[in-house]
Amino acid sequence: MWKKFFGQLQRIGKALMLPVAILPAAGLLLALGNAFQGDALQSLMPFIKAEGFQNVAKMMEGAGGIIFDNLAIIFALGVAIGLASGDGVAAIAAFVGFIVLNKTMGMFLGVTPEKAADAATGFANVLGIPTLQTGVFGGIIIGALAAWCYNKFYNISLPSYLGFFAGKRFVPIMMATCSFILAFPMAIIWPSIQGGLNAFSEGLLASNTGLAVFLFGFIKRLLIPFGLHHIFHAPFWFEFGSYKNAAGQIIHGDQRIFIEQIRDNVPLTAGKFMQGEFPVMMFGLPAAALAIYQTAKKENKKVVAGLMLSGALTSFLTGITEPLEFSFLFVAPLLFFIHAVLDGLSFLILYLLDLHLGYTFSGGFIDFFLLGILPNKTQWWLVIPVGLVYAAIYYIIFRFLIVKFNFKTPGREDKEVKSSNVAASELPFKVLDAMGGKANIKHLDACITRLRVEVNDKAKVDVQELKDLGASGVLEVGNNMQAIFGPKSDQIKHDMQQIMDGKITSPEETTVTEEGDKETAEIAAAGGGVVYAPIKGEVVDISEVPDKVFSEKMMGDGIAIKPETGEVVAPFDGVVKMVFPTKHAIGLESKDGIELLIHFGLETVKLEGKGFDILVKENDNIVLGQPLMKVDLDYIKEHADSTITPIVVTNLNGRTMEVLQHGEVKQGDKVILVK
């Protein structure tokens, strides 16, 4: 029961990231628009006092503000899409459900426009509907309900005379019905829930605010490995606390109150549950990255320098910390625990200094500048000395403990690797056994790089055995296991499914072959070759790819390209080794024996081929510059996590790889040398 609930929480936490990702754009517009209307910036740049400039500034502030004013519907749409694998029908259902819920609650409670205008009543005008104020939580509830309706009814069959309403068209209909029913209990119980939340938050802060902010920072950081931190901080940011803004509306949540106080140009009281991130993300973690680099083995420092520099800059500028945190989380849990304690203490220290800083996305310099320095409404400069002290503490602690306990942080790993003597034909049987057997498999899937398995009991999974069988990495998220077997992952998954269905009973019947391994051995003794850019765009370091399978080089080394166009051409003369069924990735082999994976975008496997047109098939011979794939780039931008495209050499095996060009490239430019 708990494991299933935990898995659902992880999915909800991930779904919350879609609407949260909108907030930085809203914050940028609001912060700049507000700053341009402020005396501080106008005294430095008198020309911005011009009427035209001020009108633009007001429009910018209004454009950003309207997003914060409508967070409830944004969260409803975002959560629905996130929990329904990106299908737009779920968003339509969420919108239908949102307006039905609010209209029904408003009519049931007899809410008039006059009542909604009085914030003290707990009512509000939501999209012009006088109704009960349920805030972001109401949006999340509707989004989750819409996703449930979609997943339950998207493929429903109806009698032929009702066939038009079958399938996905049935989802909004059911959502309207469910929302109408939900409105009555919501109208009855929500006022008590909101009152309880307010009483809890006020009591928490009144009893011991310092302890509250410390525990918030400490617990939030500890939840990051489980992906539950987004759920934990949501009540603090969007529901706890209250503030009556200049328009007479009651605003709930630390983040929303902070933004409203910026807009109202009043003294700040919010930010207690956000500001502690700045010293850690801008100073502490970059210093930890320096310690990890300096304690790496000499022969590995060049590689580690790139990883740590990228992670440190990401943390400093944007406040995205996972690339750094996951570099030491699993190999040195003690460091992560100390990191969590220091994070909580940072919240406490800034509270004791009576600072009030906030952000729209995370505690990086961009938010610090836009919502701290520009508004200039609190003593933001105190973050700098606190941060410098934090940098020293992080560096000293990390360096000392890494050396003292010989933690295998990046660059300090043992080089000895246990090789697998298992025949390729036996691999699906061995992997199934390592996963705990057929009875332990709840759901089996794969993409071109990894085997994705949801298990019933994670304790029955032998992670070390999976690595010994050839997995370059094993990721564990709740009861979901991801074993990185590279391009043969789909073959392994296919054969495992056939074994579980009783269709394969012996190794001789499997489809996984040793051909690739034999060729790899031959190639390792041969020369190298050149890889030419298959896509026009910007070449970036592979460590910048926001997917650990690629950024940590579990599949191999290479580059990534941020594409400007959707045309993919052959990067060398060779042969097509694999075209994934969902068309988002293609495996090639050059005449020099270089095996290359081109993986267009991230999580594009979920698009099921939409937006992709493959122009070749497996075993086709190809020549340099030959078109391989046409991609609808606009569709991918709208529906995928990212368009960044990893281009990975999957069979280096002792050879070296050199990146020949960074920055802007056109098709046919030399980008990789294997030697």
UniProtKB/Swiss-Prot annotation:
The active site is at C447, H599. It is a multi-pass membrane protein. Residues 3-414 form the PTS EIIC type-1 domain. One of its GO terms (molecular function) is kinase activity. PROSITE patterns: PTS_EIIA_TYPE_1 (PS51093), PTS_EIIA_TYPE_1_HIS (PS00371), PTS_EIIB_TYPE_1 (PS51098), PTS_EIIB_TYPE_1_CYS (PS01035), PTS_EIIC_TYPE_1 (PS51103). The keyword Kinase applies. Pfam families: PTS_EIIA_1, PTS_EIIB, PTS_EIIC. Residues 547-651 form the PTS EIIA type-1 domain. It catalyses: N(pros)-phospho-L-histidyl-[protein] + D-glucose(out) = D-glucose 6-phosphate(in) + L-histidyl-[protein]. Residues 425-506 form the PTS EIIB type-1 domain. Inhibited by 2-deoxyglucose and methyl beta-D-glucoside, but not by methyl alpha-D-glucoside, p-nitrophenyl alpha-D-glucoside, o-nitrophenyl beta-D-glucoside and salicin. Its EC number is 2.7.1.199. It is an enzyme of class 2 (transferase). The EIIC domain forms the PTS system translocation channel and contains the specific substrate-binding site. The EIIB domain is phosphorylated by phospho-EIIA on a cysteinyl or histidyl residue, depending on the transported sugar. Then, it transfers the phosphoryl group to the sugar substrate concomitantly with the sugar uptake processed by the EIIC domain. This is PTS system glucose-specific EIICBA component. The lineage of its organism: Bacteria, Bacillati, Bacillota, Bacilli, Bacillales.
